[in-house]
């Protein structure tokens, strides 16, 4: 199991570089905070919510709610990672809580464990 950040999930939806790496890590999970970002970006491009849900069912995507622990971890991550958004830090917090790697297509993230950059 791995955690996908919004950029990795969007890369998969768009058939962009790294999409194959996302598929190799099925089943996977995503924070509901990152899910909101994915849905917002795809619906802005004209993709229907039903189509989005159908597509992610192929991934075996599990949506994990943001917990109080995740929120507190994300808040403390700000000190070491001030350039990461709240959504990014919530993604990292979920990976920390589940003790699994986090896949991202975002080049701004480091490539240190538990972060795996897809290309």
Ranges and model annotations:
Residues 92, 96-119:
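Acidic, PIN/NYN-like endoribonuclease modules and their adjacent C-terminal/linker elements
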Residues 57-81:
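Acidic catalytic patch
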Residues 26-27, 60, 82, 99:
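Residue-level detector of structured alpha->beta connecting loops
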């Amino acid at each position: 199991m791995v955690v996908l950040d919004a950029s990795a999930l969007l890369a998969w939806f768009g058939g962009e570089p790294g999409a194959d790496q996302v598929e190799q890590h099925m089943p996977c999970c995503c924070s509901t905070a990152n899910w909101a970002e994915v849905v917002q970006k795809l619906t802005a491009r004209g993709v229907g919510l039903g189509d989005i849900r159908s597509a992610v069912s192929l991934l075996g995507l599990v949506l994990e709610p943001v917990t109080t622990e995740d929120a507190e971890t994300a808040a403390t991550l700000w000190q070491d990672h001030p350039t990461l958004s709240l959504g990014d830090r919530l993604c990292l917090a979920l990976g920390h809580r589940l003790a699994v790697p986090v896949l991202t297509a975002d080049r701004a993230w480091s490539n240190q464990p538990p972060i795996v950059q897809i290309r």
